């Protein structure tokens, strides 16, 4: 089974078949995931275009490796059909991969904070116990899809969002320190509507704050771009020691 999932890049391209110009990666997804797997402290962010589709593919790819996956979906973008399609192309029964993936969805920032806090602890424990006979050392991998999306709700003030988001990050940090790997997938957050007065500035401030914190929190940051072709580019790694990247500077000045 492993040999059929060793080069996911060719399979991932089917997501972009409608555009023949977008068919190559300067660094293959397989190479990216191999780096992620060998990284000790795994809080890895993939951000940019089509993050939801790529996260669905990665969940199936990990499940195909025999890894238990938990998906917390705050963007309502996880697609089980992508997993099924990957399984069929690898000659694996789709049910086998789907059974290894547990999905929990959130539609408000309060629900997302609960998932990232108390709920995730119980999910990881339950999945670890269920997989104990398969691997005594293997911990479930957690995919956070759209970790910022619900927190960008215009109806929730920045004063409420900041402590809620910070508590959620502390929960994730604690679990990551215990060896639970986290992959975060965030599409480009929408720019605030152009408005006159304080409300427009308020939304811009919240968006900048959330993006900055997500970048600072993540050990590795990969940017997904579809300008000319599909690209996955490393923007932050070990040597940067949590410093803000040039992309973060661009965000803060926008």
Question: Where are the predicted features?
Answer:
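Arg/Gly-rich low-complexity intrinsically disordered repeat tracts
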Residues: 2-13, 132, 243-254
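The Walker A/P-loop phosphate-binding site
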Residues: 2, 9-88, 93
């Amino acid at each position: 089974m492993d040999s059929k999932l060793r080069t996911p890049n060719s399979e991932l391209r089917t997501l972009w078949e409608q555009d023949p110009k977008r068919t190559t990666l300067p660094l293959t997804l397989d190479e990216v995931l191999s780096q992620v797997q060998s990284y000790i402290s795994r809080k890895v962010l993939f951000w940019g275009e089509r993050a939801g589709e790529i996260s669905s593919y990665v969940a199936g790819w990990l499940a195909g490796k025999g890894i238990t996956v938990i998906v917390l979906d705050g963007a309502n973008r996880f697609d089980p059909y992508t997993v099924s399609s990957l399984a069929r192309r690898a000659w694996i029964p789709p049910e086998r991969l789907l059974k290894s993936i547990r999905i929990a969805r959130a539609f408000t920032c309060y629900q997302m904070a609960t998932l990232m806090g108390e709920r995730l602890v119980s999910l990881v424990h339950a999945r670890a116990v269920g997989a104990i006979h398969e691997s005594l050392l293997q911990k479930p991998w957690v995919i956070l899809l759209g970790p910022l999306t619900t927190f960008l709700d215009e109806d929730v003030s920045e004063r409420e969002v900041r402590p809620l988001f910070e508590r959620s990050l502390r929960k994730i940090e604690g679990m990551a320190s215990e060896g639970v790997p986290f992959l975060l997938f965030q599409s480009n957050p929408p720019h605030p509507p152009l408005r006159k007065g304080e409300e427009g500035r308020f939304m811009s401030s919240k968006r900048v704050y959330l993006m900055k914190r997500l970048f600072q929190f993540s050990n590795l940051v990969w940017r997904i771009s579809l300008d000319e072709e599909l690209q996955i580019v490393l923007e932050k790694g070990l040597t940067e020691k949590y410093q803000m990247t040039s992309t973060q500077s661009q965000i803060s000045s926008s």
